[in-house]
């Protein structure tokens, strides 16, 4: 039967999309179109009578607890694999938490420590699974490190520790042609002044890291040279140990010990083993490309030319070590070079050596301390510093105001700073002028009056008339705009006026009463107190004629315009007085 079914042909039903045998296809097609329908969502064939149930059970929209909407048939798979609020178990404490909070909880829970029963160390909880693999190995490594002496291996070189020293050494070596430093024999080690150091001195912190770095750099260079020349390995190893001992002994020593001829006290090695020390031997080496320096025109090897030109440049910062001469420089002893370098390094001249100083130091400059703050400055800068010094006392700023007298008429609320800033113009009277001339007003002023002097400055007279009033010794107030004459002048004028009333006066001796404006010169400054404004009737005129007496009670008042009127000729004034 199976073979028969396999051999027979089949056709695809258009309704249910299934393969139907050919001999049953007609019956199936009629039955399928009548009773079976296809779901429009999932495209699966279902009986038409069960289509509504299928749509309600499988394809209705539901909401998950994570507020996501999806079909009901997909809810189960979403809740098991995709929902962020599904429960999960912590791998450290077996506590069920939502997936959203699980990561934060595991980080916190895994940071706890538990005591290992095997090695006795506190181990993190998150490392408990991998700890048995390394348990006990840390203690073995520590024991191994303690068993190995420090001299058995070289300390790894730190770039940030020796960078400064290496750069300085390169610049110093570039000053002169490269040469090998003379070795120091081991028998000189016992004669070294630093050999008698105690254990406490060896444990002190290094006060001169620059010297130590220099020794270590030199030690590394000697090690490299020893690799290039195996025949001198014994000498180089001895020199290496000796330089290491020097670097250890130099720690914690005072600066004075370095300056007391440390480099001269050590005996030099055999000159025969020191290698070439002359400039001609080094430059005459075979198979070397020599190029001239663009500054000093000397020949140097190709690999050292850049370093030499950097140090030979006149604008380079190494002015203290480089003489700047364009001539051929002599070969200097390396011990002298290192000694000068150490002395400059210990005297706080690192900025000059490294090229960090902004400008060269001022030579032959006098350093004087500030008298207020004590800061030591150069002579050229000290004057400007003391003028603006913060420590300067307050009394030093009021020297210019000591000679100014106090002002009586100044209001109380006027600040001293405001009065100090007021500018005094030429010709103005000072505010304390009246206080200075009070004693003179008591004695009585004496003036040399010239009767023939005419008024030629009305403005000066008006300024004198409008001066402010001041205190007076007597109770009587003076007339406005009239200056008080002394006793002798007033008696002469009164006598002449009385003589004119009694009889005729000769034309040659006519009394003249001059206007008050022309009694004094235009630049005359009075030195007596002024009275308050009042009324004075010296120029009063009545209908019957001019009165011959001066009466303060019955006197009239002339306006300012009448006072400013130009004076008459002297002859006309005399004739008018004779008519009266």
UniProtKB/Swiss-Prot annotation:
GO terms for biological process: negative regulation of innate immune response. Keywords: Acetylation, Metal-binding, Phosphoprotein, Zinc, Zinc-finger. A zinc finger (TRAF-type) spans 27-103. Residues 395-453, 468-509, 524-580 are annotated as: Disordered. Induction: By lipopolysaccharide (LPS), IFNB1 and IFNG, IFNB1 being most rapid and potent inducer (at protein level). Not induced by anti-inflammatory cytokines, such as IL4 and IL10, which also inhibit LPS induction of TRAFD1. The keyword Phosphoprotein applies. Gene3D superfamilies: Zinc/RING finger domain, C3HC4 (zinc finger). This is TRAF-type zinc finger domain-containing protein 1. Residues 407-417 have a biased composition (Polar residues). It comes from Mus musculus (Mouse). Expressed in skeletal muscle, brain, liver, kidney, spleen and bone marrow. Expression depends on STAT1. The keyword Iron-sulfur does not apply. The modification Phosphoserine is found at residues 278, 320, 326-327, 409, 415, 430, 450, 469, 532. Disruption phenotype: Mice show no gross developmental abnormalities, but exhibit an increased susceptibility to LPS-induced septic shock and are more sensitive to poly(I:C) shock, suffering more severe hepatic damage than wild-type animals. In response to LPS-stimulation, bone marrow-derived dendritic cells display an increased production of pro-inflammatory cytokines, such as IL6, TNF and IL12, as well as elevated IKK and JNK activation, compared to wild-type mice. Mutant embryonic fibroblasts are more resistant to vesicular stomatitis virus (VSV)-induced cytopathic effect. The modification N-acetylalanine is found at residue 2. One of its GO terms (molecular function) is zinc ion binding. Negative feedback regulator that controls excessive innate immune responses. Regulates both Toll-like receptor 4 (TLR4) and DDX58/RIG1-like helicases (RLH) pathways. May inhibit the LTR pathway by direct interaction with TRAF6 and attenuation of NF-kappa-B activation. May negatively regulate the RLH pathway downstream from MAVS and upstream of NF-kappa-B and IRF3.
């Amino acid at each position: 039967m199976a073979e028969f079914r396999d051999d027979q042909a089949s056709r695809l039903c258009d309704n249910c999309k299934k393969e139907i045998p050919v001999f049953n296809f007609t019956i199936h097609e009629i039955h399928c179109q009548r009773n079976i329908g296809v779901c429009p969502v999932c495209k699966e064939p279902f009986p038409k009578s069960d289509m509504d149930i299928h749509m309600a059970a499988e394809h209705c929209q539901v909401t998950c607890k994570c507020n996501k909407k999806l079909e009901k048939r997909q809810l189960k798979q979403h809740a098991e694999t995709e929902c962020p609020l599904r429960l999960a178990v912590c791998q450290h404490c077996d506590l069920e938490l939502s997936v959203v909070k699980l990561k934060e909880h595991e980080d916190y829970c895994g940071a706890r420590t538990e005591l290992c029963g095997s090695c006795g160390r506190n181990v993190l909880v998150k490392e408990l699974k991998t700890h048995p693999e390394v348990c006990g190995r840390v203690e073995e490594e520590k024991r191994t490190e303690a068993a190995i002496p420090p001299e058995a291996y070289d300390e790894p070189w730190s770039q940030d520790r020796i960078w400064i020293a290496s750069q300085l050494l390169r610049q110093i070596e570039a000053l002169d042609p490269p040469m090998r430093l003379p070795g120091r024999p081991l028998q000189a080690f016992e004669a070294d002044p630093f050999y008698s150091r105690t254990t406490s001195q060896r444990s002190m912190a290094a006060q001169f890291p620059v010297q130590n770095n220099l020794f270590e750099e030199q030690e590394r260079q000697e090690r490299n040279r020893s690799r290039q020349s195996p025949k001198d390995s014994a000498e180089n190893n001895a020199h290496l140990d000796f330089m290491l001992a020097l670097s250890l002994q130099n720690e914690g020593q005072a600066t004075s010990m370095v300056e007391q001829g440390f480099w001269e006290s050590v005996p030099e090695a055999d000159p025969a083993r020191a290698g070439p020390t002359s400039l001609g031997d080094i430059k005459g080496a075979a198979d070397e490309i020599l190029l001239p320096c663009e500054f000093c025109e000397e020949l140097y090897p190709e690999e050292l030319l850049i370093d030499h030109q950097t140090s030979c440049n006149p604008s380079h910062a190494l002015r203290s070590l480089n003489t700047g001469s364009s001539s051929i420089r002599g070969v200097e002893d390396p011990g002298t070079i290192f000694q000068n370098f150490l002395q400059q390094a210990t005297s706080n001249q690192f900025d000059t050596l490294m090229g960090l100083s902004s400008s060269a130091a001022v030579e032959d400059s006098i350093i004087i301390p500030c008298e207020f703050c004590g800061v030591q400055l150069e002579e050229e800068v000290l004057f400007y510093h003391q003028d603006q010094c913060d420590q300067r006392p307050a009394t030093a700023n009021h020297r210019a105001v000591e000679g100014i007298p106090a002002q009586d008429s100044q209001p109380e609320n006027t600040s001293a700073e405001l009065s100090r800033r007021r500018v005094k113009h030429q010709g103005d009277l000072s505010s304390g002028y009246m206080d200075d001339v009070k004693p003179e007003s008591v004695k009585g002023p004496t003036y040399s009056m010239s009767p023939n002097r005419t008024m030629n400055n009305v403005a000066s007279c008006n300024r004198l008339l409008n001066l402010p009033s001041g205190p007076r010794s007597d109770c009587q107030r003076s007339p406005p705009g009239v200056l008080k004459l002394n006793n002798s002048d007033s008696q002469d004028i009164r006598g002449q006026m009385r003589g004119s009333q009694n009889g005729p006066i000769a034309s040659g001796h006519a009394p003249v009463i001059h206007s008050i404006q022309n009694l004094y010169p235009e630049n005359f400054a009075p030195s007596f107190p002024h009275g308050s404004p009042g009324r004075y009737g010296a120029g009063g005129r009545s209908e019957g004629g001019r009165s011959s007496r001066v009466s303060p009670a019955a006197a009239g008042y002339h306006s300012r315009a009448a006072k400013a009127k130009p004076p008459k000729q002297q002859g006309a004034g005399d004739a008018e007085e004779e008519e009266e």
